[in-house]
Amino acid sequence: MKIYTYHTPERVPADWQPDCAIAVDVLRATTTIATALAAGAEAVQVFSDLTELEQVSQQWPAAKRIRVGERGGKKVAGFDMGNSPAECLPERVRGCRLFMSTTNGTRSLERIQASPLVLAAALVNRAAVAEFVQKHQPETVWIVGSGWEGSYSLEDTVCAGALIHYLWGQQDAPLETLAGNDETIAATALYRYYQDDLLTLFHHSSHGQRLLNLGNEADLKYCAQVDILAIVPWQVSPKLLTKA
């Protein structure tokens, strides 16, 4: 197995696809996706374009659809939910399909949609995703962070490092043999440094600061938890995720 880490979807190679691609947007899209599916949502369908989301969701029964829209950390006017995992209560999402568009995370999922195996990971479901990857043993794995509008993010990199660290622990080999690029080694180092204080890292990050300024400290605390959900969101058709 070779693991390649890319900090943003813009950094992903255009001329080849891995056997497995994992999208990461810890604050907050992939955390919300995992939480919604764990709470009983039927599926999450992602869109980069809000207009397309509205058109497609109109074809779904109103009682069974939830429109999730976020731009700049804020809920989009007229949508049912913003991009907060705290809104994904079982009584609200059970049996429903979430139609979701966010500033960053949904772009990552769209960028890797052609890969044979597409997963969504966050810290909350880190072990579940890593065990799923370990079981399937893909030869090449991409971990694709979402960043913020094309720029690097600490929180996605530390989550990539958490995944790599877990997978590395299942291998009888040095990290260099698992790493496909230097970013994989750097992400692992970041996680090893902050693994016992992830919330502090989130407070240092630019997007963490952005969410704090919007009054979303509870989301940061939730998203900083590790291995609390035994859920693996995987793509069953382009841009449509259910639990594996």
UniProtKB/Swiss-Prot annotation:
Reaction equations catalysed: (2R)-O-phospho-3-sulfolactate + H2O = (2R)-3-sulfolactate + phosphate
Claim: Magnesium is one of the keywords in the record: yes
Domain of life: Bacteria
Positions of disulphide bridges: none
Molecular function per GO: 2-phosphosulfolactate phosphatase activity; magnesium ion binding; sulfopyruvate decarboxylase activity
Cofactor field: Mg(2+)
Pfam name, any one: 2-ph_phosp
The keyword RNA-binding is assigned to this record: no
EC number(s) per entry: 3.1.3.71
Keywords recorded for this protein, A-Z: Hydrolase, Magnesium
PANTHER family: 2-PHOSPHOSULFOLACTATE PHOSPHATASE-RELATED
UniProt cross-references to HAMAP family, sorted A to Z: ComB
Family to which the UniProt record says this protein belongs: Belongs to the ComB family.
Protein name: Probable 2-phosphosulfolactate phosphatase
Organism: Thermosynechococcus vestitus (strain NIES-2133 / IAM M-273 / BP-1)
